[in-house]
Amino acid sequence: MAERNPFTPAFGTVPPIMAGRDRLLAELHAALEQGVGDPNLSSILVGARGTGKTACLTRLCEDASDAGWVSASSSAIPGLLDDILQQAQRASAQLVKPKPQRQLTGLSVGPLGASWDMGDEERGNWRTRMSALLEGLNARDVGLLITVDEVDASLSELITMAVVYQHFVRERRKVALLMAGLPSHVHALLNDKSVSFLRRAQRHPLGTIADADVRDALKRTVASGGKTIDEEALGICVEATGGFPYMLQLVGYRSWQSALGKAEVGKEDARAGMRAAQEDFREHVLASTYRELSAVDLRFAKAMLP
């Protein structure tokens, strides 16, 4: 039987151990437990690529049901509003029975015909349909957690969603909105006058992780897969991660692969894993970040070089 690698560098995959994010996750989970009125129910996770924003959103959605919530997850792409509505309807299907979409209001003979009333909710806009869903959920004391990844201020649907969410909060609906994005994208969103109220949302910067937390996560993850890791190898891996959650998973994954068939991850495995992970990081993270830089950003970056 092939060895199962316990590290998870795949995009959006939640690692078994969320290094350095315990306090943040506990704080946001407590907000769901507290319910209406907690300021963290409107939060924005801000961080560079590889800092674990998507993984945090995913973990919170997984935990939401324990606090009496259903969740609807999406990304800031065209079709956002419909996607949130459909995900919310699907998540609440066992709790809220949909009302008949149309009723027969008239019947004529010769020629045979019928007239139908589609109902207020079916004719209504996104706010009307979401309000009906929230009423059904809130009647059972169930909240709706909406998460939006990769925020993009240029997407009009994101602005619409945020404005409507503000009305839900004013109406004291049991609803939460957690968003995540790159610093420049979040800055652009908060500068949009239509959603200036989002400036009062809780902002949680996701920076690098302390070496002690990285070391602990690496050691525990290796142990969960049935191996041990040499202390020197552990030091090499910790230094190679640079405190980035994605690099933690990547270095761990590559080092484990190098140690297949062995009981221990040694220093040579760690060095091989470090080299492979650094190449992956350059290709998948740094190159993407570089391509997004403006001409002004590039001139500034070059000026900072020694």
Regions found by a protein language model. Give the residues of each.
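A short, basic N-terminal segment
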Residues: 1-41, 87-90, 94-97, 104-105
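Walker A/P-loop nucleotide-binding motif
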Residues: 37-59
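Conserved catalytic segments around the Walker B and adjacent sensor/switch elements
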Residues: 44, 61-80
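Conserved NTP-binding/hydrolysis module of P-loop NTPases
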Residues: 65-70, 81-114
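Conserved Walker B catalytic segment
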Residues: 117-185, 191-194
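A short helix-turn-beta junction within AAA+ P-loop NTPase domains corresponding to the substrate/partner-engaging
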Residues: 191-207
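Conserved small helical "lid"/interfacial subdomain of P-loop NTPases
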Residues: 206-233, 240, 251
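Winged-helix-like regulatory helical subdomains adjacent to P-loop NTPase cores
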Residues: 249-306
